[in-house]
């Protein structure tokens, strides 16, 4: 139901789609302030979405979300949606996982987002930070949860094997942290890479998570008709494959981003939320339309979409399907 109160501890009630905030970073948008965020939030919340995902690392994202949510508070009270944000990543090469900074960052996020609590806080991109520092930051998040400042906490990152191992480790007595509540995985369940499917059971059963969130379903601009953004860390070969996939889709009168969106939703619906990055009302409505197309077909792809996906994965991506790129530092403690 729209505008229904949510239980911040019940992550199972997070909507199937989550409104993302990375698009408000200058990496993706030259003028984030020009995005009609208030209209986007109002439309999203009026059509079943009840969660946002942001981060201090995403430029002015928290500030812009905070302003928009504050302006909409009479129509959408704070207790009718989840706010998910992150801590620890400051810049492309700058991280601070100290307990003091984690605490400072959480309180700063509360101020920016005009809230007294955060529903979920992820430790941002853990693969870039040394293991002992990760543990200290997670212990501080546990303390903040015990104090009620945050309701849930977890980790985010790209290398799904390390993310899974770390989540499992936290659930052991040795960690002195306790089970995490959630993991946000990005670029691991999309048209080019579906490895997240192989790790979900471990994350839920062994790590005892409440929620596994799937983000970057267009693989940070790789899976779209426009050119892949320059900052994307994938190989030249994979970039070329994506370009070929876009051309193939165009020949079939299908947009690659639409197909990729439907694929990710069909694979993850019922398993966890999918984070959407939209920068306009048109993109939001298109994403919701794609969701409804999949939902109306029993949460499956149409036969045409299924054939297109199979061709792209087997005949275009070929050996580059499930190809990964380097991210983070070595973690020899992972066994």
From Swiss-Prot:
Its EC number is 1.1.1.116. Pfam families: Aldo_ket_red. Keywords: NAD, Oxidoreductase. It catalyses: D-arabinose + NAD(+) = D-arabinono-1,4-lactone + NADH + H(+). The active site is at 58 (proton donor). Gene3D superfamilies: NADP-dependent oxidoreductase domain. One of its GO terms (biological process) is dehydro-D-arabinono-1,4-lactone biosynthetic process. One of its GO terms (molecular function) is D-arabinose 1-dehydrogenase (NAD+) activity. NAD(+) binds at residues 221-287. The record marks 86 as: Lowers pKa of active site Tyr. Substrate binds at residue 124. Disulfide bonds: none annotated. InterPro entries: AKR, Ara2-like, NADP_OxRdtase_dom, NADP_OxRdtase_dom_sf. It is an enzyme of class 1 (oxidoreductase). Belongs to the aldo/keto reductase family. Aldo/keto reductase 2 subfamily. This is D-arabinose 1-dehydrogenase. It comes from Saccharomyces cerevisiae (strain ATCC 204508 / S288c).
